[in-house]
Amino acid sequence: MAEHGESSEDRISEIDYEFLAELSARFGMNLVQLAKSQEEEDHKERMKMKKGFNSQMRSEAKRLKTFESYDTFRSWTPQEMAAAGFYHTGVKLGVQCFCCSLILFGNSLRKLPIERHKKLRPECEFLQGKDVGNIGKYDIRVKSPEKMLRGGKARYHEEEARLESFEDWPFYAHGTSPRVLSAAGFVFTGKRDTVQCFSCGGSLGNWEEGDDPWKEHAKWFPKCEFLQSKKSSEEIAQYIQGYEGFVHVTGEHFVKSWVRRELPMVSAYCNDSVFANEELRMDMFKDWPQESPVGVEALVRAGFFYTGKKDIVRCFSCGGCLEKWAEGDDPMEDHIKFFPECVFLQTLKSSAEVIPTLQSQYALPEATETTRESNHGDAAAVHSTVVDLGRSEAQWFQEARSLSEQLRDTYTKTSFCHMNLPEVCSSLGTDHLLSCDVSIISKHISQPVQGALTIPEVFSNLSSVMCVEGEAGSGKTTFLKRIAFLWASGCCPLLYRFQLVFYLSLSSITPDQGLDNIICTQLLGAGGCISEVCLSSSIQQLQHQVLFLLDDYSGLASLPQALHTLITKNYLFRTCLLIAVHTNRVRDIRPYLGTSLEIQEFPFYNTVFVLRKFFSHDIICVEKLIIYFSENKDLQGVYKTPLFVAAVCNDWNQNASAQDDFQDVTLFHSYMQYLSLKYKATAESLQATVSSCGQLALTGLFSSCFEFNSDDLAEAGVDEDVKLTTFLMSKFTAQRLRPVYRFLGPLFQEFLAAVRLTELLSSDRQEDQDLGLYYLRQIDSPLKAINSFNIFLYYVSSHSSSKAAPTVVSHLLQLVDEKESLENMSENEDYMKLHPQTFLWFQFVRGLWLVSPESFSSFVSEHLLRLALIFAYESNTVAECSPFILQFLRGRTLALRVLNLEYFWDHPESLLLLRSLKVSINGNKMSSYVDYSFKTYFENLQPPAINEEYTSAFEHVSEWRRNFAQDEEIIKNYENIWPRALPDISEGYWNLSPKPCKIPKLEVQVNNMGPADQALLQVLMEVFSASQSIEFHLFNSSGFLESIRPALELSKASVTKCSMSRLELSRAEQELLLTLPALQSLEVSETNQLPDQLFHNLHKFLGLKELCVRLDGKPDVLSVLPEEFLNLHHMEKLSIRTSTESDLSKLVKFIQNFPNLHVFHLKCDFLSNCESLMTALASCKKLREIEFSGQCFEAMTFVNILPNFVSLKILSLKGQQFADKETSEKFAQALGSLRNLEELLVPTGDGIHQVAKLIVRQCLQLPCLRVLAFHDILDDESVIEIGAATSGSFQKLENLDISMNHKITEEGYRNFFQALDNLPNLQMLNICRNIPGRIQVQATTVKALCHCVSRLPSLTRLGMLSWLLDEEDMKVINDVKERHPQSKRLTIFWKWIVPFSPVVLE
């Protein structure tokens, strides 16, 4: 290490790019690019952070404390990181070494933090084992005193002499002043930061900044004569009372401890491993191959335990594995050779010379062994012996000491340490759970304040009567056993103060048993014995040095008298008791508790810790699990307790496929299997409990209830006092008048509800079936099925029975047609709070519905079909469900990927029922959407002058573009991480050869693509060959058609439609298109070129029915169409848009030869031959849609033929000018004859303005009208006609557009708002104005608007640009929006995007 306080600033890389490339390939993600970007960001953060030796984080316990707010979804546990020298910085997820300042932001499943630390900073002095002041998490301040101070005791009576001893005081302890220490009577011993009182001999170490030497002296050695000479008894008492933890504990309790010190275990990094104990390591070699040439004893001494596979052994400390042992191999030498930095080896080496000395020092004191001075104030006072004890007292002392020895032997045996789990979890090793720190909070009985505690803090605060409460399987037993093991192993100095520790299971005792009998039976075994008198004497004499760990507490009434008294009258005995109790059993013991500890949910990093150790031979399956949960954050909480982890370990052991296809439902199945094995003797009782709890879960789920009271339980038939219930539900009583019950998790509630629903639907009782149908029918919309109840239905399918499945399938497949439910979709807020990720899913689905109802329908249909098929196949009822499935498929459009479903392999003929299949091919060629030109509208517009309170009505385009660019960048990054996948044609129908049936119609959507690669071409060739008809929709994909020429040439007779937008067609591509003989529809729009070769030869498409050309600003389109085009008599749609002058005579000839024309759109700027055009149109009796724009229109000529179009559904004359009143009146009268009209965009002009009221009245006679638009013609009188004429009229109106009507005054708007009513289907209302015509309105008008909006129940879009609204106005409008039936969908557009900032008036 450099000088203390300095650190290397070299750039470091935490990423294993070789492994990352492997991971990218495995999961189809480009993680390397993402990692490089993240690494650069981390480096910038690293450069900002403070470096240098951090003496405040020398303590491992303090480092551990910094992780309280750490993200639990990580691969490293806080214990591993703190032991490796790291503390949480609070900057993102960054951790930093207290010694070398190494900063890490990432975790690694394959590399532990200590390994990552060694790789990146091998020179770190902490790692090298040098004295940098590290304080182990279980270490204590009290140290064993030196036999003789340097220079003799007498010389240190003077403070200056004591001060001189601190000449080599270590750098890391400078936070504690040598002057203050010497003043408090301490002398530096020269070892680490250990000091010793010259008077009483008390020795203390582990000094940290802020420590008060006088306080420490008073706490640990209150009888010191020097201390008493300097401080009054009151001051000493205050010091002791204000000390945190260690109540009633002094230094004497630690120094006189009977616990053997396991010296090689001083390292903080390995003192949690139970395999630090040689006997436990030895026990793991029971199945060691007999033919192995290496002795088990040598392997054990070298720190190894057997993994159970081949001849592979693993070091308990460094985790290193060795195998393939040969004759003559020395395990210790090989350990040193391959893993020289192993902490166990280093500690073993450094302790080799010290062990004999310390072992004799720590030997149990005997009256005849003392050689110390008899001075009362000397060190001998601390090491007092039993020389003054009477004979009877000496007897209890010897028996107690012997008992302590027997207890320690018991707690370090495998039979004690191994988890007592039934056979479902029997393979879970001892080391995997005892090494995990549970998450604990402390709740002081007399105070509502709760606080998180680390395990060292718990151990420091053990006193009086305490309980540790938690769910069934939360780790209470493990926690108590861990305390007993750590005490017995000598690895935990914090527990040295206890001379006797009794772990007693209360589930196997009877009320008439004596305490001595219980201890003998449970802990001492055959031959073990302790007298009641001796036990009583030991408890009375040792008091606070006795710790009872009472497991499986169920109530005071069932306890033997001795234990009952210890709990209820602890003030008489002053022993320490820690009682493990289920959460719902705490109430009757609470009056006797000082502190209650509560075990929280099992952190996910503990799950990873266990699985990483248990499946170290197959780490890939653990990686898959982590990725699964990273993609499904809502499911991370399923590992609520260690018991769930044990269940999945068992499932993975028994079912290898579960490792590759992990699903949360298998976890719950494994957990229920565990319960069935645990309670197989009472199977009927278990079934009844699961059934009643399932009923409660089901009722709660459908009423959005996730908390229950006693009445709810009683109504569902749940017995809250039955122990089985505690494995399914939790009881919460803290700070509540009545207890509240919850299931082990929201997902577990859904799982039990699913079990119950299947039970009901499968029942032979009609009442049960009816109840099941009642619940099933509450899932009455597709959105509920694929969102709020998606997980629930998935769980139901995993239990599906042959009787229930057809009922569920029929119901699900009928939901897609529930249109009314779709229009009233709203999320379940209570459910969303529990499943925040589901809320994002809901937002996506709702957004899809708003943007593209057609895509939403296809998406929902596919999802429901997949779910229905899961039910059918899981229950083996495909034949019974097929009629429902076939009916569902008829006439429907679905995604191509559904053909991978097994059903289309089994029933390929069902393919013929579909209307079409869609496939999308998306590339990375971004089309810029931010280059729109604002010049057309804004170039001659002056910035508006407005009051400051209205400036929020305008947003500068640069800000808008900046936000859009950020979104675009996010999209690019996402696409780089997730490469575009090829259409999947690997399963189901695609495995049939030959294909018995073809896809009726294939719709191919290609977006932002360049030329296709060979892999995509191969896929398209196979898909095209399996299609009867193919339709192309290409957007921003120049060069794509040429690249798939081989596929098109093989299937050219199948291509019926080609729609192309924003792309350039090469000459080769135009020639390729001309070879498609079956083309019926051709669309070309928004291109920068005129594909003249294609257009010159349009007549070669003999089956062409639709031609759509939208090329604003390009050369005259009509001029390049061939004369032979008129021979295409089947034309049904002709849409021409060009902004140049056109010769309409050719167009007239075309129309005259198109008798089947249904749709006609025209935009151009030439007026000649208009009358002949209208005459030609009049002959088209089948026209359903007419749109005119540009300058090609003569009003009277068109009005004269308008009554001929009795089948007309859409008439768009937006922007056409009707100047005279006579023509306008005739137009209004003609409208009355268009009884089938659905959409009307009214023309403009003075004439139309004069007859606007008449037009409104005529529209009232149009029963099918859905869209109505008036621009620039309405005034106060005419607009009120619309409002006043709504009684019984406009019932189907969905879109009312009255924007840009600047003749309407504020009063006119107000009257209109007050009158508008009874439009039940109106979804869009547009009242926008242009910027010069902006309007500033009074509060009464805003109020009228709000009342109007509240009377339009289907409104989802309100446009009101140029309405100047202040903060108060928007508050009123937003309040109405929140209360509106469509509040989740209603969007209000009121803000202009402009290339200027408004002028603010003073």
Swiss-Prot record:
Could you tell me which residues the BIR repeats occupy? 60-127, 159-227, 278-345
Keyword tRNA processing present in the record's keywords: the answer is: no
According to the UniProt entry, its GO molecular function terms are: ATP binding; cysteine-type endopeptidase inhibitor activity involved in apoptotic process; metal ion binding
- Keywords of this entry: Apoptosis, ATP-binding, Metal-binding, Nucleotide-binding, Repeat, Zinc
| SUPFAM superfamilies with a match to the protein in the record | Inhibitor of apoptosis (IAP) repeat, P-loop containing nucleoside triphosphate hydrolases, RNI-like
Q: Show the Pfam families listed in the entry.
A: BIR, NACHT, Nlrc4-like_WHD, NLRC4_HD
**Which part of the chain is the NACHT domain?**
464-759
Keyword Lipoprotein, does the record have it? no
Positions bound to ATP: K476
- Identify the domain of life: Eukaryota
The cross-references to InterPro entries, in alphabetical order and at most eight, read:
BIR_rpt, LRR_dom_sf, NACHT_NTPase, Naip, Nlrc4-like_WHD, NLRC4_HD, P-loop_NTPase
- In its UniProt record, which GO terms are filed under biological process? apoptotic process; negative regulation of apoptotic process
Residues reported to bind Zn(2+): C315, C318, H335, C342
Task: Report the function annotation for this chain.
Answer: Prevents motor-neuron apoptosis induced by a variety of signals.
- In Swiss-Prot or TrEMBL terms, this protein is called Baculoviral IAP repeat-containing protein 1g
Q: Which organism is it from?
A: Mus musculus (Mouse)
